[in-house]
Amino acid sequence: MGFEIAKTNSILSKLATNEEHGENSPYFDGWKAYDSDPFHPLKNPNGVIQMGLAENQLCLDLIEDWIKRNPKGSICSEGIKSFKAIANFQDYHGLPEFRKAIAKFMEKTRGGRVRFDPERVVMAGGATGANETIIFCLADPGDAFLVPSPYYPAFNRDLRWRTGVQLIPIHCESSNNFKITSKAVKEAYENAQKSNIKVKGLILTNPSNPLGTTLDKDTLKSVLSFTNQHNIHLVCDEIYAATVFDTPQFVSIAEILDEQEMTYCNKDLVHIVYSLSKDMGLPGFRVGIIYSFNDDVVNCARKMSSFGLVSTQTQYFLAAMLSDEKFVDNFLRESAMRLGKRHKHFTNGLEVVGIKCLKNNAGLFCWMDLRPLLRESTFDSEMSLWRVIINDVKLNVSPGSSFECQEPGWFRVCFANMDDGTVDIALARIRRFVGVEKSGDKSSSMEKKQQWKKNNLRLSFSKRMYDESVLSPLSSPIPPSPLVR
């Protein structure tokens, strides 16, 4: 077997065999555990519930209804007359009507407070492709980007794996709700300089994944001023722009650039990554967008986009749907309402058993605080707790360490990729796990919390002796899952 591995490595490239992909991180290992034992209400009611998938399935019925009412929007139905034109080779600039519809949709998701030029819209194969393409445009192997942590685990794949760049965390702390501070940004930059690492830019995810929080104007202005002062790029990943379900509203970096006091900024250093995967719930369509204020970057990204184009059929369909302003307005309004309702239901269910989450107003997930359940404040203890949740409680949640969080005990848990019934089953499992059954318990909420703290504040393994020989996701032979956000 060793000979086979050595032989394989010798005939493949270093890029193909390096470990920068991040596939073996706990974030993706949770996916493997789910794949090996997926929950189904009838076929496998005791299976693992997928709560590691940041997917928005709450409004797909609205899209289905639109398709039924607009059969000409698809070449598979009444739009068949357009089949030949769509099947032919297309310029990688993209269909003009598609780019126009995307620009208009980006404006609507930002409250109509900013305008986007369709000529600056560049296509890519999902946000994954868009993020990698923008890095290829801006940096060389060995260069680095600063990224506030905790941050999306698959950035290692999207931004590092094939580009050869480094990611340097800007450490944020729970003491101020993980807000980005000027001090932390400066410290990360200066440490890189001392190590002779060339910093080419800073990457913001706004709204944040995994925090589900939005950045205020002051923070955006501060970061923008810093990047301009040091002549480095600012890449804003805004793929969760329309997932805001509570105040404060989302503020795009494009809005900051439009403000009078920021006219001195060099717009050539600012770039936006967008997608329809989260806001519309269409990750399978693989629609990623690069929007740059730099002409050279637009031209370069457009040439590179030939490696990851959006299919013409997809462009045709989306151009029709997103051009329906009445539909878009209703969709965005209904999506925000449903996300808010689901978030409230889920977080209230956690609060009943004393589990708190970081206060958030956006996203498809919560940043869940399980620090009281750790035996000790270490990442080893976090991983032990995570294994119990995966193998015993049968929930795939993502440990904070995979998001480069510096404090053990935080977990990202997704709530928008399932129906109401599955959410309730997940909450019931959590209640059983912490020893507080809602049914038959007539004590007050405060008494429940006190009892929970008394009995379960420090996770005891005496009743659930964890046998390391039990299948661990880390050693699972299950093939890798599709690596999605």
Curated annotation (Swiss-Prot):
Its EC number is 4.4.1.14. It is an enzyme of class 4 (lyase). Pathway: Alkene biosynthesis; ethylene biosynthesis via S-adenosyl-L-methionine; ethylene from S-adenosyl-L-methionine: step 1/2. The keyword Repressor does not apply. It catalyses: S-adenosyl-L-methionine = 1-aminocyclopropane-1-carboxylate + S-methyl-5'-thioadenosine + H(+). GO terms for molecular function: 1-aminocyclopropane-1-carboxylate synthase activity; pyridoxal phosphate binding; transaminase activity. It comes from the Eukaryota. Coiled coil: none annotated. Gene3D superfamilies: Aspartate Aminotransferase, domain 1, Type I PLP-dependent aspartate aminotransferase-like (Major domain). Substrate binds at residues 55, 92. The keyword Phosphoprotein applies. Induction: Hormones, such as auxin, environmental factors, such as mechanical wounding and a number of chemicals. Its cofactor is pyridoxal 5'-phosphate. Phosphorylated on Ser 460; phosphorylation may regulate its turnover. May be processed at its C-terminus. Keywords: Ethylene biosynthesis, Fruit ripening, Lyase, Phosphoprotein, Pyridoxal phosphate, S-adenosyl-L-methionine. SUPFAM superfamilies: PLP-dependent transferases. Changing residue 286 to L: Loss of function; due to a strong reduction in both substrate and pyridoxal phosphate binding. 1-aminocyclopropane-1-carboxylate synthase (ACS) enzymes catalyze the conversion of S-adenosyl-L-methionine (SAM) into 1-aminocyclopropane-1-carboxylate (ACC), a direct precursor of ethylene. The stability of ACS proteins, and the regulation of such stability, play a central role in ethylene biosynthesis. Belongs to the class-I pyridoxal-phosphate-dependent aminotransferase family. PANTHER family: 1-AMINOCYCLOPROPANE-1-CARBOXYLATE SYNTHASE-LIKE PROTEIN 1, BIFUNCTIONAL ASPARTATE AMINOTRANSFERASE AND GLUTAMATE/ASPARTATE-PREPHENATE AMINOTRANSFERASE-RELATED. This is 1-aminocyclopropane-1-carboxylate synthase 2. It comes from Solanum lycopersicum (Tomato).
